[in-house]
Amino acid sequence: VLSQSIVWSGAQAQTDQTSEQDMRRALVGQSAYAACKMLHADYSQKRVDLIVATAIKTNKWESQKDWLKSSQATQTIQLVSEAMNQECTDFNQNSTQFVPAMEAIEALW
């Protein structure tokens, strides 16, 4: 299971009471998964963009589209995607990016 906080946030993002922080964590999780697939499974940029766009629409995260372009978002997505295992199903806890990725997720605001 990918980070429990990201998975939990993804489930919580479907409620009206979801905080902005929870939405951002869930969006980072979806985006990092897609970026990981681009790194390890040869997904095209178009396919990655479609995964993220579908997640935004399905989960009603439109309010976070601009934030997704921020340096905080892009850096966190990069760290998280690089900390994932080759299958993009979980974190590689031996990755040098693991601790920085966890810290970046916790720092989302």
Regions found by a protein language model. Give the residues of each.
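Compact alpha-helical subdomains of small soluble proteins
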Residues: 47-109
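Bacterial N-terminal signal peptides
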Residues: 1-5
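Short N-proximal segments of mature Sec-exported proteins
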Residues: 15-67
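Sec/Tat signal peptide C-region and signal peptidase I cleavage site
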Residues: 7-13
